[in-house]
Amino acid sequence: MDEKTKKAEEMALSLARAVTGGDEQAAIKYATWLAEQKVPLRVQVKPEVSPTQDIRLCVSVEDAYMHTVTIWLTVRPDMTVASLKDMVFLDYGFPPSLQQWVVGQRLARDQETLHSHGIRRNGDSAYLYLLSARNTSLNPQELQRQRQLRMLEDLGFKDLTLQPRGPLEPVLPKPRTHQETGQPDAAPESPPVGWQCPGCTFINKPTRPGCEMCCRARPEAYQIPASYQPDEEERARLAGEEEALRQYEQRKQQQQEGNYLQHVQLEQRSLVLNTEPAECPVCYSVLAPGEAVVLRECLHTFCRECLQGTIRNSQEAEVSCPFIDNTYSCPGKLLEREIRALLSPEDYQRFLDLGVSIAENRSTLSYHCKTPDCRGWCFFEDDVNEFTCPVCTRVNCLLCKAIHERMNCREYQDDLAHRARNDVAAQQTTEMLRVMLQQGEAMYCPQCRIVVQKKDGCDWIRCTVCHTEICWVTKGPRWGPGGPGDTSGGCRCRVNGIPCHPSCQNCH
């Protein structure tokens, strides 16, 4: 080393010590000498100046197709932009040559630190633009080699080169150019076979359904070349995918068969019990698994006692779900097998008898045997005049609606009129009913024509014989022919908010 170079190094070190110690005069002196000698220098702030604690950096990443995503990186303010590029390369696979960093609205250079760009606190932001690799010389082998070199540098191994495994190939002499041989150059190498990822431009193998780098789906228009032969690695991957698909289909089939068997077993049960803790919406009892009943039609859950009480107190052949709140009344019905499983044999028989009685009373073509306390009845047709009761075996006349086995119809009618003239009690009863009908204190049922009257309360009543719901104020049926809820007929009370009559006192 000559004297001039040695002197320049001493003056540079003296300048560094003077700046560090805050000696302005000495720093000016040394800097002036170095400037006069035109000594080339590189001035760089030591890492100790920047904070060393880790911070969270918010990075907005955008590619050539204007796709944007936000990621968070754990960095130190004293890191250089080059180190930041290496971090992104190792973590996300984007080579440093494709990264353009913008920090504080300024293009960052590799040797600059994050601290110099104002990155000092958690939540500070930066912008990363990813260049397209379409026009670069990157290929999968070069990309893998760069990643391995970066990993070796992180481990402290520098100035290394990666050698391929296996026996060394003999060094071939350099081929002569066409100027030396007088022949044209060989044809350029054919482009690699595969499809190019529209996101990161990586060339993937033809059979791969998604990008190996960014997992983006293969373009739908791409067709695998007919002459393409997969290599060993691809064949292994395809075999693994086929095996995974086979196992998936097998598990799916097993699950379907299990679900089917579960449904079959559930269908064979009369009652569906709850599998999770539930609360009865009627009595608010907390029910453990297996203590409540889930109705098949509407899936509402109740305790057994509340359902049994609902069935016993029902006046209809079809028992409605008892669920009701301020906004909703469930229209679901209990199934016959659910009712049979909930009730005792005696209660179930009474329920069946109620259904038969309702069916009889609501039919205009039904006739009940006139024998006292006899349960026999029938549906009659126009061409049938007599009914032999299967219970008491008495013969009923369907024309006279009576039993007169030793008289014909004319004789029975004459005898009935004669007895009515001499029966004072019958005459008084007939007169009382006529007066009540005239004064509006009683009315004929619009279905079965018996006399009904209202004791007190609202204007809704139910016929005790045919169970027809009646609107007292309009003297007609409450609902249409479809039954409860059918507003196509009946009094149509509260349809569009309009009462059925100015004097209506709520007919439900």
From Swiss-Prot:
Zn finger (RanBP2-type) start-end: 188-220
Ranges annotated as RING-type zinc finger: 280-330, 445-474
Changes after translation: Auto-ubiquitinated. Auto-ubiquitination leads to degradation by the proteasome. Phosphorylated. In vitro, phosphorylation inhibits auto-ubiquitination activity.
Parts forming coiled coils: 231-260
Region (Disordered), start-end ranges: 161-191
Taxonomy, superkingdom: Eukaryota
Record SMART domains: RING, ZnF_RBZ
Binding residues annotated for Zn(2+) 2, in chain numbering: C298, H300, C321, C330
Binding site for Zn(2+) 5: C445, C448, C463, C466
GO BP terms, alphabetized: defense response to bacterium; negative regulation of necroptotic process; positive regulation of apoptotic process; positive regulation of canonical NF-kappaB signal transduction; positive regulation of extrinsic apoptotic signaling pathway; positive regulation of non-canonical NF-kappaB signal transduction; positive regulation of transcription by RNA polymerase II; proteasome-mediated ubiquitin-dependent protein catabolic process
Positions of region (Interaction with TAB2): 1-268
Keywords tagged on the record: Acetylation, Coiled coil, Metal-binding, Phosphoprotein, Repeat, Transferase, Ubl conjugation, Ubl conjugation pathway, Zinc, Zinc-finger
InterPro entries (alphabetical): BRcat_RBR_HOIL1 (IPR047558), HOIL1_RBR_mRING-HC-C3HC3D (IPR047559), LUBAC_E3_Ligases (IPR051628), Rcat_RBR_HOIL1 (IPR047557), TRIAD_supradom (IPR044066), Ubiquitin-like_dom (IPR000626), Ubiquitin-like_domsf (IPR029071), Znf-RING_euk (IPR027370)
Active-site annotation: C458
Expression tissues: Widely expressed.
Modified residues (Phosphoserine): S50
Entry keyword annotation includes NADP: no
Any one GO molecular function term: ubiquitin binding
Entry-annotated residues carrying N-acetylmethionine: M1
SUPFAM superfamilies registered for this protein in UniProt: Ran binding protein zinc finger-like, RING/U-box, Ubiquitin-like
Binding site for Zn(2+) 1: C280, C283, C303, C306
PROSITE patterns linked to this entry: TRIAD, UBIQUITIN_2, ZF_RANBP2_1, ZF_RANBP2_2, ZF_RING_1, ZF_RING_2
Protein's job: E3 ubiquitin-protein ligase, which accepts ubiquitin from specific E2 ubiquitin-conjugating enzymes, such as UBE2L3/UBCM4, and then transfers it to substrates. Functions as an E3 ligase for oxidized IREB2 and both heme and oxygen are necessary for IREB2 ubiquitination. Promotes ubiquitination of TAB2 and IRF3 and their degradation by the proteasome. Component of the LUBAC complex which conjugates linear ('Met-1'-linked) polyubiquitin chains to substrates and plays a key role in NF-kappa-B activation and regulation of inflammation.
Protein name: RanBP-type and C3HC4-type zinc finger-containing protein 1
Organism this protein belongs to: Rattus norvegicus (Rat)
Record lineage: Eukaryota, Metazoa, Chordata, Craniata, Vertebrata
Gene responsible for this protein: Rbck1
